[in-house]
């Protein structure tokens, strides 16, 4: 036989005992504030107190001191009330962050989870309310629906964070302001429609007509609400605009007329191509009051981007011009390219010459240092074009002899002294420079085919093979630059290695090639 109310009666009895100080065997000190409680209740609700009482001796369990810089006294009082009541009553004077810090210190994971959910919901609500404040235009009398109530205050009961669903903020689309006769008084916009019991009929909302002297510009975009901006906002930057009455939504004109700025000397002249002038249309005079039949809002259209046939042609030519920044494969390695492969584009005479920078790298920049071609392998005329090409494309890794002037503390080049661009060391030949480059790149291109160990220099691999795999291998008298760069090191025809291989002796194969691994 079960008694469902037994747990509630037990908690109520414990609350009464704590309030009277009856059988309270523990005092919790949070700063200078004391809290009387029962050890069994504290240890049952918090793993922190459970470990504390297990580790302490019997005569040292009466007083528990908690760091008051982490756990505040009001937050601990709320958690202590939760232990005895099973309900967390969040008050306005205690920040939710303090409750979260206290629950984390006491290892009360359920309270931590609830506090995090509430903080996330509050952050989302504040972000949505800020977005709505930015999008809402106070001058156009935009009213939210009755279901949009914004963030709710913190309550005693715990609610899941899923309450902030998209249906909470879903409302009808913002209606366009409707003009009303002059004798009808406008509805005041000071009423608060966010309360649940107040609803406003949208058919009775009327926006006051704008004054004749102050014409406003309405800028509409698909991702934001309509904002009303005075005409003098564009007085400094944009040219004058033409004014025409707003066309009803159910009336579709036969041909859409593009309204463009009348002044062509504005700041947008260099960005947009000129468009053919549309046929002039009679614009209403601002000094005259509109007729009763045409008692509608006057909307000023600002067309910043004019769509024309010329702009469509320019958009089709744009991919071809972007390809012209880099030369084709035949232009770099083939010396003189053909006229069709050169940088020739119609109407591209307005390109400016780009100075030397790191944005345009040679095609060989992805190769390692030991595979880069030497000074003699570069062509002087990389690109032959009637248009100026970027200067960085003409600069090889090893400049020709005319670049004898000093170029800073590193990379000083002379005619016969190759210099490392990284550390500034000079070498006798370009092969030594490429061999030295592996010190900076940390590359190990030479790999042993027997044990797959990698080495930076070919000589190290040769000595490893001679010592580890074949002790009788002939010593190298002098490194061969041509054999060790790309083709690899091959044993001489009259060496001991070739004779041993031809005789068919036992042991591992003696024919090998030293070179960079693929």
Curated annotation (Swiss-Prot):
<feature type="compositionally biased region" description="Basic and acidic residues">
    <location>
        <begin position="472"/>
        <end position="481"/>
    </location>
</feature>
<protein>
    <recommendedName>
        <fullName>Zinc finger and BTB domain-containing protein 3</fullName>
    </recommendedName>
</protein>
<feature type="domain" description="BTB">
    <location>
        <begin position="24"/>
        <end position="92"/>
    </location>
</feature>
<keyword id="KW-0597">Phosphoprotein</keyword>
<feature type="modified residue" description="Phosphoserine">
    <location>
        <position position="495"/>
    </location>
</feature>
<feature type="zinc finger region" description="C2H2-type 2">
    <location>
        <begin position="446"/>
        <end position="469"/>
    </location>
</feature>
<feature type="cross-link" description="Glycyl lysine isopeptide (Lys-Gly) (interchain with G-Cter in SUMO2)">
    <location>
        <position position="478"/>
    </location>
</feature>
<comment type="function">
    <text>May be involved in transcriptional regulation.</text>
</comment>
<feature type="region of interest" description="Disordered">
    <location>
        <begin position="126"/>
        <end position="207"/>
    </location>
</feature>
<feature type="modified residue" description="Phosphoserine">
    <location>
        <position position="308"/>
    </location>
</feature>
<feature type="region of interest" description="Disordered">
    <location>
        <begin position="349"/>
        <end position="368"/>
    </location>
</feature>
<feature type="region of interest" description="Disordered">
    <location>
        <begin position="472"/>
        <end position="518"/>
    </location>
</feature>
<dbReference type="InterPro" id="IPR011333">
    <property type="entry name" value="SKP1/BTB/POZ_sf"/>
</dbReference>
<keyword id="KW-0832">Ubl conjugation</keyword>
<dbReference type="GO" id="GO:0003677">
    <property type="term" value="F:DNA binding"/>
</dbReference>
<dbReference type="Pfam" id="PF00096">
    <property type="entry name" value="zf-C2H2"/>
</dbReference>
<feature type="cross-link" description="Glycyl lysine isopeptide (Lys-Gly) (interchain with G-Cter in SUMO2)">
    <location>
        <position position="131"/>
    </location>
</feature>
<keyword id="KW-0862">Zinc</keyword>
<keyword id="KW-1017">Isopeptide bond</keyword>
<keyword id="KW-0238">DNA-binding</keyword>
<dbReference type="GO" id="GO:0008270">
    <property type="term" value="F:zinc ion binding"/>
</dbReference>
<feature type="cross-link" description="Glycyl lysine isopeptide (Lys-Gly) (interchain with G-Cter in SUMO2)">
    <location>
        <position position="132"/>
    </location>
</feature>
<keyword id="KW-0863">Zinc-finger</keyword>
<feature type="region of interest" description="Disordered">
    <location>
        <begin position="310"/>
        <end position="338"/>
    </location>
</feature>
<dbReference type="Pfam" id="PF00651">
    <property type="entry name" value="BTB"/>
</dbReference>
<dbReference type="InterPro" id="IPR013087">
    <property type="entry name" value="Znf_C2H2_type"/>
</dbReference>
<keyword id="KW-0677">Repeat</keyword>
<keyword id="KW-0805">Transcription regulation</keyword>
<dbReference type="GO" id="GO:0005634">
    <property type="term" value="C:nucleus"/>
</dbReference>
<keyword id="KW-0479">Metal-binding</keyword>
<dbReference type="InterPro" id="IPR036236">
    <property type="entry name" value="Znf_C2H2_sf"/>
</dbReference>
<feature type="zinc finger region" description="C2H2-type 1">
    <location>
        <begin position="418"/>
        <end position="440"/>
    </location>
</feature>
<dbReference type="InterPro" id="IPR000210">
    <property type="entry name" value="BTB/POZ_dom"/>
</dbReference>
<keyword id="KW-0539">Nucleus</keyword>
<keyword id="KW-0804">Transcription</keyword>
């Amino acid at each position: 036989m079960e008694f469902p109310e037994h747990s509630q009666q037990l908690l109520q009895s414990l609350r009464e005992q704590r309030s009277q100080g009856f059988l309270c065997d523990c005092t919790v000190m949070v700063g200078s504030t004391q809290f009387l409680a029962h050890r069994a209740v504290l240890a049952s609700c918090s793993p922190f107190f459970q470990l504390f009482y297990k580790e302490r001796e019997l005569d040292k369990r009466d007083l528990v001191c908690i760091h008051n810089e982490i756990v505040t006294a009001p937050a601990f009082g709320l958690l202590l009330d939760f232990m005895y009541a099973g309900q967390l009553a969040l008050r306005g004077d205690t920040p939710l962050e303090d409750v979260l810090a206290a629950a984390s210190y006491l290892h009360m994971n359920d309270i931590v989870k609830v506090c995090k959910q509430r903080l996330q919901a509050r952050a989302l609500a504040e972000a949505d309310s800020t977005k709505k404040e930015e999008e809402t235009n106070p001058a156009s009398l935009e009213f939210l629906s009755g279901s949009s109530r914004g963030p709710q205050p913190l309550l005693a009961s715990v609610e899941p964070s899923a309450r902030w669903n998209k249906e909470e903020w879903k409302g009808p689309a913002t209606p366009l302001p409707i003009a009303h006769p002059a004798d009808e008084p406008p509805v005041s916009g000071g009423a608060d429609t966010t309360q649940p019991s107040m609803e406003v009929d949208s058919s009775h909302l009327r926006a006051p007509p704008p004054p004749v002297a102050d014409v406003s510009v309405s800028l509409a975009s698909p991702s934001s609400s309509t904002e009303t901006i005075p005409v003098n906002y564009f007085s400094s930057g944009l040219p004058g605009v033409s004014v025409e009455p707003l066309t009803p939504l159910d009336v579709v004109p036969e041909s859409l007329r593009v309204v463009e700025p009348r002044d062509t000397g504005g700041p947008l002249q260099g960005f947009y191509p000129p468009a053919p002038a549309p046929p002039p249309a009679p614009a209403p005079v601002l000094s005259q009051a509109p007729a009763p039949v045409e008692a509608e809002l006057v909307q000023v259209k600002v067309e910043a981007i004019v769509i024309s046939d010329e702009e469509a042609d320019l958009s089709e030519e744009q991919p071809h011009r972007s390809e012209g920044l880099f030369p084709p494969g035949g232009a770099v390695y083939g010396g003189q390219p053909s006229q069709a492969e050169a940088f020739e584009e119609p109407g591209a005479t307005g390109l400016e010459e780009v100075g030397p920078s790191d944005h345009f790298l040679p095609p060989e920049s992805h190769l390692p240092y030991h595979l880069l071609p030497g000074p003699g392998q570069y062509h002087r005329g990389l690109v032959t074009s009637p248009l100026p090409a970027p200067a960085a494309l003409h600069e090889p890794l090893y400049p020709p002899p005319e670049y004898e002037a000093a170029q800073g503390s590193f990379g000083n080049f002379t005619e016969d002294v190759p210099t490392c661009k990284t550390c500034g060391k000079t070498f006798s030949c370009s092969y030594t420079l490429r061999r030295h480059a592996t010190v900076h790149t940390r590359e190990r291109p030479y790999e042993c085919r027997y044990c797959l160990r990698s080495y930076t220099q070919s000589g190290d691999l040769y000595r490893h093979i001679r010592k580890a795999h074949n002790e009788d291998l002939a010593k190298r008298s002098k490194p061969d630059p041509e054999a060790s760069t790309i083709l690899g090191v091959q044993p001489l025809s009259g060496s001991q290695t070739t004779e041993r291989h031809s005789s068919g002796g036992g042991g591992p194969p003696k024919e090998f090639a030293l070179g960079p691994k693929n």
